[in-house]
From Swiss-Prot:
Gene name, Swiss-Prot/TrEMBL: rlmM
Gene Ontology BP terms: methylation; rRNA processing
Designated name of the protein: Ribosomal RNA large subunit methyltransferase M
Family: Belongs to the class I-like SAM-binding methyltransferase superfamily. RNA methyltransferase RlmE family. RlmM subfamily.
Catalytic reaction annotation: cytidine(2498) in 23S rRNA + S-adenosyl-L-methionine = 2'-O-methylcytidine(2498) in 23S rRNA + S-adenosyl-L-homocysteine + H(+)
Amino acid sequence: MNTLFMHCRPGFEGEVCAEISEHAALLGVAGYAKGKPQSACAEFVCTEPDGAQRLMHELRFAQLIFPRQWARGAFVELPETDRISVLLEHLADLPVCGSLWLEVLDSNEGKELSTFCRKFEVPLRKALEKAGRLVDDARRPRLLLTFISGRRVFLGLAEADNSALWPMGIPRLKFPREAPSRSTLKLEEAWHQFIPREQWEQRLNDDMTGVDLGASPGGWTYQLVKRGMLVTAIDNGPMAESLMDTGLVTHLMADGFTWKPKHTVDWMVCDIVEKPARTASLIETWLGEGLCREAVVNLKLPMKQRHAEVRKLLDRMEAGFKERKVKVSIACKQLYHDREEVTCHLRRLDLKPH
């Protein structure tokens, strides 16, 4: 159980390796990271037997930016027939699990294996329950089986409350037909990622005001309108008629980087294609000056040193808020619907809700 296995967006294996190595060094967990380019996964192999468990115990999964899912465990080679007996053998020394997820990688090979996983899950679940290895209990660890092929699986464990919200970290969101662009799913996923479901009524409701910087044609505005908010859309480009017809949107032809609201708004969202450092200073201004209470903003990533750049900008924002003596929580994740970008969520903790 000395390997930490992580899923990620294909092409971001290096970022996962850099990020987990940094955390491991800070926590004094010895080991090395490896990830094949475009494989959609990376590993951190610990030199001590309890290394992976220590990492998962000391870190919150939500702190990690690039991994989509994680599990501690080991690879198991499977025979062509009677895979279940081999898995049961390996599970004998592990704790009884409280849930089971079968996962595949976000690659063409992974997609081909998903049918096999669907068929295999039913008999496997029955066998695990019969053997007393699987019970229905959220407090127990989750058993995560990531199939690399029909003959090779990563047999891993993770705590249900300290791992991805969805299998492989991939949300099943349906594209709403009336939304003006596919980017709408990025913001919807961000709500799920950063705001506990039981707080949606309180933090995303129709008494609120929102601003969408760089709004055209309105993919992100659509999500704010769907929650019943009054939205100011800032963009020199056109907005979708369907959004304007709701009567909830005011469209101002202005530059998203210079426009400011007269009063504090509840939400600012921004998905502008711009150098990440410029977007980061925009975030600093909006939260630092109390122009908004919460924000979801995308940072577009450079081609190289992507983890280092994100880390630098997050540290800079944190230092900026400290200097201004304002309390802001900062979270950052590469969402499933993100491409060469990460999504930041920020919240002023010292502003009274309206």
